[in-house]
């Protein structure tokens, strides 16, 4: 022991490069390594070793690997290089006299340490750039996605560049020196300026991109469960609660997406992280991992997990780069002014070594999906967590079917107290064959209500619908993979409910446009209507650029069929407050016929006959869809829309069960929804056209103002017809 301590406190044979020679002086030691410093370095090295091994094992055993997880895995390899470098230097403290191999070992130690330092900082910038790109890339770039081979290629390129820069002293530019705490670069060489230039460039780019990312990921004005990617939903992305049983094909599985991104403006289209399944060949890239395997967490926990990965990776990137900042600044100061301080040198080295110990924090994102939190992000468990943890949480005796006519399509979102064998899935049953006793009676009691009701959609289809390939049928049956492509058919989309409650439909499929399609005489499940695109639905690249500044505000023109009884048919709207944290007003029950479908409040200073640029106010009812037992059945939302152009559509929303909320979809064309309700008197049939433009709201408001009490909106007429139908059925 005394032999070891004497080496530490007396002559440690540390190297110092001679300024007059390119050879290293092996016998001169500028300072000594104290026992406390030696123990501290050993502890930090051991912590970095354990952490890097833990990170590698955890990340390599992930069932679904994302781009971020692969990049962080390479970070762990850099940490191992750092551990190896410091371990080599620690070995050099043992011999009492310098050996012939000391110079080679010290050079190797310095080379590895500088290589991993450069690689770690460059990858930190790369990770931040990737996060910024995926959350802000334009719609036109949606078709391009990172493949596994590309990710590995970028990682190897960073390592190659780092090794090239670190090996320049071996080529005669700069030298490595031995210090009391490690083998590092001689600060008197101009080589230091090159290192600082590379680091400063990476740090500058990281700092610029981190400002908006920090706001989006840590200080976002949106709620924690941010709204889903519109492009992902419009492509038919599967959502939590969708049955994942074998042989069951969902509506166009997601394009290797892991998370819905955050809100962005200026025409950007938030994108999602790419998932690589185990054993996926590099050449197949994003297209190979499209199918969800039953029982995997990808369909249930992917959103909060991937969002947490982005948050943790951002924090780790900033941490690593900042921990290297003191060393880089000190090296430049020493080179420029010749300032030298052993305590500062030691502190900067320890901080750079500490940067190799923080990588395991990324693995915690799997368990701390709601962290890190900051600003206004709520760290407490929220009502949305039930939808993401895959647990069975049943409502107390309440179930309904919610049918949406929106964005040129009809969507039915069931919510029942029936669950299949998959613990992560909610079972959706055919409306004519409900397995829940609670739904059999309403359908039987109200069969007459649906005997002759026809709901049709009249649209003006766009001329440039986007091309989409790899379409799966929206069916719930076992079908071979070779038959997953849609069949092209001509016809009109309609849903008819007849006396035997059979649903018959014909679909339209023109060119690349997707339509709902079913095999002949096949009786679809309710899941057939989940996130299936209709013929004329807008595609992301056709979105109008004239939307409102705030994507989440309101929508109108959506028809909602409430409850299996079908007694009421109402327009629905939804609004999140400006801060995105709560819904106003408070949840309460409102009778549909008392609510205003669309309304207009002109400026009191203006003439009643003039309708300039004012706000359109909508008072409507929407069913709240969540697994919270304490939640009320309905909420009433008030929405305000202000548009400068009378012809521009106001934003629309669609419901996302994955988010348990409505999400924005900005549409650029006008559409109207036609409802035909036959009565016993052929002359009394009601044909209602519900427009959804701001101008239509103003016209309705003008009519309401002019006709006063005599004016009735379409929804009021429809409810009156339902009440009349109900009275006739009771009279019979």
Curated annotation (Swiss-Prot):
Q: Where is the composition biased (Basic and acidic residues)?
A: 511-526
Q: Where are the transmembrane segments?
A: 37-57, 70-90, 111-133, 157-177, 191-211, 312-332, 344-364
Q: Which domain of life is it from?
A: Eukaryota
Sequence ranges on the Cytoplasmic membrane side:
58-69, 134-156, 212-311, 365-732
Answer yes or no on keyword DNA damage: no
Coiled coil regions, renumbered to chain: none
CDD domains in the cross-refs: 7tmA_GPR149
Keyword annotations from UniProtKB, A to Z:
Cell membrane, Disulfide bond, G-protein coupled receptor, Glycoprotein, Membrane, Receptor, Transducer, Transmembrane, Transmembrane helix
* Biological process, per Gene Ontology: antral ovarian follicle growth; negative regulation of ovulation; preantral ovarian follicle growth
**What spans does the record annotate as topological domain Extracellular, numbered to this chain?**
1-36, 91-110, 178-190, 333-343
Q: Where in the cell is it found?
A: Cell membrane
Sites where a glycan is attached: 7
- Topology of the protein relative to the lipid bilayer: Multi-pass membrane protein
Does the entry annotate any disulfide bonds, and if so which pairs?
106-183
The record's annotation in PROSITE patterns points to: G_PROTEIN_RECEP_F1_2
What InterPro entries does its record include?
GPCR_Rhodpsn_7TM
Q: For this UniProt entry, what is the primary localization, expressed as one broad class?
A: membrane
Query: In the UniProt record, which is one GO cellular component term?
Result: plasma membrane
Q: Which PANTHER family is this protein grouped with?
A: G-PROTEIN COUPLED RECEPTOR 149-RELATED, NEUROPEPTIDES RECEPTOR
Described purpose of this protein according to its UniProt entry: Orphan receptor.
Family statement drawn from the similarity comment of this UniProt entry? Belongs to the G-protein coupled receptor 1 family.
Protein name, entry field: Probable G-protein coupled receptor 149
**Gene it is expressed from:** Gpr149
């Amino acid at each position: 022991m005394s032999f070891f301590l004497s080496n530490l406190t007396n002559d440690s044979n540390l190297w110092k490069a001679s300024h007059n020679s390119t050879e290293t002086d092996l016998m001169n030691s500028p300072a000594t390594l104290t026992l406390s410093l030696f123990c501290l370095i050993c502890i930090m090295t051991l912590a970095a070793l354990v952490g890097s091994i833990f990170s590698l094992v955890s990340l390599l055993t992930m069932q679904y690997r994302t781009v971020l997880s692969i990049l962080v895995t390479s970070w762990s390899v850099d940490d191992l290089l750092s551990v190896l470098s410091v371990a080599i230097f620690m070995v050099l403290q043992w011999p009492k006299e310098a050996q012939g191999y000391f110079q080679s070992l010290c050079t190797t130690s310095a080379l590895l340490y500088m290589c991993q330092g450069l690689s770690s900082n460059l990858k930190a910038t790369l990770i931040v750039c990737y996060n910024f790109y995926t959350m802000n890339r334009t719609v036109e770039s949606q078709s391009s996605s990172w493949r596994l081979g590309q990710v590995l290629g970028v990682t190897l390129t960073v390592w190659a560049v780092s090794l090239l820069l670190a090996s320049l002293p071996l080529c005669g530019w700069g030298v490595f020196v031995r210090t009391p705490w490690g083998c590092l670069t001689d600060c008197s060489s101009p080589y230091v300026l090159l290192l600082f230039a590379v680091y400063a460039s990476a740090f500058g780019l990281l700092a610029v991109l981190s400002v908006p990312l920090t706001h989006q990921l840590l200080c976002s004005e949106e709620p924690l469960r941010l709204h889903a990617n519109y492009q992902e939903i419009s492509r038919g992305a599967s959502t939590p609660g969708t049955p994942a049983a074998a042989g069951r094909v969902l509506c166009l599985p997601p394009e290797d997406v892991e998370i819905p991104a955050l809100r962005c403006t200026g025409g950007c289209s938030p994108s999602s992280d790419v998932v690589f399944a185990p054993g996926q060949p590099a050449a197949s890239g994003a297209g190979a991992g499209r199918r969800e395997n039953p029982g995997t967490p990808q369909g249930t926990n992917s959103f909060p997990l991937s969002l947490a990965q982005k948050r943790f990776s951002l924090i780790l990137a900033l941490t690593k780069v900042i921990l290297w900042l003191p060393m880089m600044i000190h090296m430049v100061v020493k080179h420029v002014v010749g300032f030298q301080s052993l305590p500062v040198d030691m502190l900067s080295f320890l901080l750079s070594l500490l940067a190799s110990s923080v990588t395991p924090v990324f693995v915690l994102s799997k368990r701390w999906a709601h962290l890190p939190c900051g600003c206004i992000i709520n760290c407490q468990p929220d009502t949305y967590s039930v939808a993401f943890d895959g647990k069975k949480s049943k409502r107390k005796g309440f179930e309904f079917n919610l049918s949406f006519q929106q964005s040129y399509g009809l969507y039915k979102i069931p919510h029942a107290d029936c669950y299949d064998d998959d613990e992560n899935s909610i079972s959706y049953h055919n409306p004519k064959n409900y397995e829940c006793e609670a739904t059999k009676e309403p359908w039987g009691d109200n069969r007459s209500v649906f005997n002759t009701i026809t709901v049709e959609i009249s649209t003006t289809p766009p001329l440039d619908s986007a091309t989409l390939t790899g379409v799966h049928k929206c069916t719930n049956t076992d079908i071979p993979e070779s038959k997953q492509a849609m069949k092209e058919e001509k016809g009109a989309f309609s849903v008819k409910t007849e006396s035997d409650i059979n649903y018959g439909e014909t679909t339209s499929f023109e060119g690349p446009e997707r339509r709902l399609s079913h095999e002949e005489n096949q009786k679809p499940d309710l899941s057939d209507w989940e996130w299936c695109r209709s013929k004329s639905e807008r595609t992301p690249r056709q979105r109008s650029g004239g939307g409102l500044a705030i994507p989440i505000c309101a929508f109108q023109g959506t028809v909602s069929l409430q409850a299996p009884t079908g007694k009421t048919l109402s327009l629905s709207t939804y609004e999140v407050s400006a801060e995105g944290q709560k819904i106003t007003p408070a949840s309460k029950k409102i009778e549909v016929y008392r609510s205003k479908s669309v309304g207009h409040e002109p400026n009191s200073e203006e003439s009643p006959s003039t309708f300039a640029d004012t706000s359109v106010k909508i008072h409507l009812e929407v069913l709240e869809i969540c697994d919270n037992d304490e939640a009320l059945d309905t909420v009433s939302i008030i929405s305000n829309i202000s548009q400068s152009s009378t012809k521009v559509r106001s934003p629309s929303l669609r419901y996302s069960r994955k988010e348990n909320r409505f999400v924005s979809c900005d549409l650029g064309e006008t559409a109207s929804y036609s409802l035909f309700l036959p009565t016993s008197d052929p002359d009394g049939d009601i044909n209602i056209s519900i427009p959804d433009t701001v101008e239509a709201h103003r016209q309705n408001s003008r009519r309401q103002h002019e006709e006063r009490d005599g004016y009735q909106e379409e929804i009021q007429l429809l409810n009156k017809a339902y009440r009349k139908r109900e009275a006739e059925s009771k009279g019979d």
